[in-house]
Regions:
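Active-site/acyl-donor-binding loops of N-acyltransferases
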Residues: 65, 112-181, 237, 243, ...
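Conserved donor-binding loop and adjoining core beta-sheet/short helix segment
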Residues: 5-115, 138-145, 243-280, 321
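Amphipathic coiled-coil/heptad-repeat helices and related helical stalk/stem segments
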Residues: 95-99, 223, 285-286
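Short, hydrophobic/aromatic alpha-helical segments in well-folded domains
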Residues: 101-102, 226, 288-289
């Protein structure tokens, strides 16, 4: 088995691989051009790799290179292996492709991280743990805006008959509404803040980054250039928050009508995808985002946040903590650089804007 960069001549073999993978519902990009190609001056880009066995593609993965602020200095590291697929899930003779892809990725970039993954029950998470990666959950928070819609649709709770009956009882009485609102009554007053939805990130985002970055021990660079690459999609809501003449923070959000979502069912799901501010402004920035999504019709608002200050900001904005399957995994080399890990991890800034981005939201 040989793992090599994905080049134009391999596209027919990838199409054949995808055809064989149809029963598993998995696929690899059929274009060799990455979503984020290497461009001069850009500090965010991807490389694609494929596993070849006698000119047949048996798997593939991506590496996403980014500039990170790590302990008060900027370094290029990589996220991955992203989007890894292997024919081993259909044919046991290729079951080692996933391990070979991981080892190849570490040879190319020893300082690797992965976010998302889907929980410790996933095979990829078990592989990383066995390979001595440091793995932890990025905390998950939610705020219920419409208790009736929430209780009718929350599949995570309603999958058990007893809980389904309880949810229905709470929905049909005022107890559900009263209980949810009582649990979430922690909203701070807005200190003369102004929030606006903007089409793009400008120089004001650089000012926030330069002012706030020292409060983070591990965070992807979030200047205007990087944000314009990662957060330019038409679905995304980009909010700029100001107080007086000064911009104090920003938030990237989604507000998506869901159909058959595996956790939330058929609700309008508001998502706080990414954010940046200093510790003195985080609560106000989070409250502005929460108010906007509530006014925009969200039934439930969710966010994954790792930094202590953003977790406090969610709590004071009336969010509750729930179980998280959104994981952060650090390669042994990167974990070693971030010691003492338990102490520094409190100032990591990982959100749904990292890794593969806000998929499934």
């Amino acid at each position: 088995m040989q793992i090599k960069p994905y080049t134009p001549d391999l596209e027919p073999a990838v199409r054949a691989f995808n055809h064989r993978m149809l029963p598993a519902g998995e696929r690899f990009p059929e274009s060799h051009v990455p979503d984020y190609p290497r461009l001069d001056g850009r500090r965010v880009y991807q490389d694609y790799f494929v596993a070849l066995d006698k000119n047949q593609v048996r798997g593939g993965y991506k590496l996403m290179y980014q500039a990170f602020w790590i302990r008060d200095r900027v370094e290029m590291i990589a996220g991955g292996p992203q989007g890894a697929v292997s024919e081993g899930i259909l044919d046991p003779q290729f079951r080692m492709v996933g391990i070979q892809a991981l080892m190849d990725a570490l040879r190319r970039e020893p300082q690797l991280f992965a976010v998302g993954i889907g929980g410790m029950q996933q095979g990829f998470a078990r592989l990383l743990k066995a390979s001595r990666w440091a793995i932890s959950a990025v905390p998950f928070y939610f705020r219920v805006v419409d208790p009736g819609r929430f209780l009718s649709n929350i599949r995570y709770l309603r999958q058990r008959r007893g809980m389904a009956l309880l949810c229905e009882f709470l929905r049909r009485t005022c107890l559900g509404h009263l209980g949810v609102h009582a649990a979430q009554m922690r909203l701070p007053k807005l200190a003369n803040c102004r929030a606006e939805i903007v089409p793009e990130f400008g120089g004001w985002a650089d000012e926030i980054w330069n002012r706030a970055r020292h409060e983070y021990s591990f965070v992807a660079v979030r200047d205007a250039c990087v944000l314009s690459v990662l957060h330019s999609g038409p679905r995304l809501l980009r909010m700029r928050v100001s107080r007086g003449s000064q911009t104090i923070g920003w938030v990237v959000m989604l507000n998506t009508p869901m159909k058959g979502h595996k956790q939330f069912g058929d609700v309008r799901l508001g998502s706080i995808v990414d954010c940046m501010a200093g510790s003195g402004d985080a609560a106000q920035v989070m409250r502005c985002a929460t108010e906007y999504l509530e006014a925009d019709g969200a039934d439930v608002i969710v966010s994954n946040q790792s930094h202590d200050m953003w977790r406090r900001a969610l709590f004071t904005s009336g969010f509750l903590r729930g179980p998280s399957n959104y994981l952060l995994a650090l390669s042994p080399r990167l974990s070693e650089k971030l010691q003492p890990l338990k102490e520094l991890q409190r100032r990591f800034h990982l959100t749904r804007g990292d890794g593969d981005g806000p998929i499934h939201l």
